[in-house]
Amino acid sequence: MAERKVVVANETGLHARPAASLVQFVKNYPGEVKIIKEGKEANAKSIFNVMSLGIAKGTEITLVVEGEDEEKFADELVEFINNLSE
């Protein structure tokens, strides 16, 4: 299991388009990916789960990746989130 903390910098947080982009990116990973915000956990492969967390700009989230090459994918996921645009 690989865990990473990241602060969401995107102006709109993880809503609508950024959330959809994130889900599409994560769906390519064969393992399990979760996002945790303030104790609430969501499956990162589900747009509804991701959006239900209400992640705004400046929110710290924890990413949990389990599966093949989890450390590498966790790092790629942090980079993806840091580069999200509206």
Where do the model's predicted regions map?
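Intrinsic-disorder/low-complexity, polar/charged segments enriched in Ser/Thr/Lys/Arg/Asp/Glu/Gln
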Residues: 1-5, 60-62
